[in-house]
Amino acid sequence: MTPWPSQREFSKRAFELSQTRRHLEYHPGTNPPSFTAVVEEVTDEGGVILSESWCYPRGGGQPGDTGVFIIDGKSFPFGEVTATQSINHPLLKSGLANGDEVTCVIDRDRRNSLAKMHSAAHIVSAVANERWGAITVGNQLNIESSRMDLKFENRELFDKDQLTEDANYWVDEDVGINVHQWGRDQIMTDDRVRNKR
């Protein structure tokens, strides 16, 4: 028989289920604005769980946001945001407490660099699919460089110089990028979506 959770465990579980993950409601995009939230918990490991967060957590090959909390003129930087049940903002110096209202400033330069890299990854993925029927099966994006794992129908036909030339063609054309707020059902039924795993 599973024992009843303690009051602290129960409260924590209830909060974890209710934390508002704003990045899921609206694509994080570029130039994220600052936002205000309440510190719901400072974890034993030194992380901060907020009442709501616009920070994008690490996952799926995409690095998480970093930034700084500001309260009463004091700055508290946080490292790369992660998520399990809640979005965790790991503090790089202590000093925040439960109930503090903080302004969260996301590192815009980092977010914007990652957004560019993310767009470039989509271009490379599309070019590899169009030219060789390749499917992107994994990736690890970063600010300076990224890795993409491509699965080819016939690996022998692949030419990295051709891939570079094709991808740069689309970059040089300065083609606009559209961001859609689609649910899974729409994604899975749209013919333009290449990889529907």
PLM feature spans:
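Active-/binding-site microenvironments in catalytic and ligand-binding cores
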Residues: 2-197
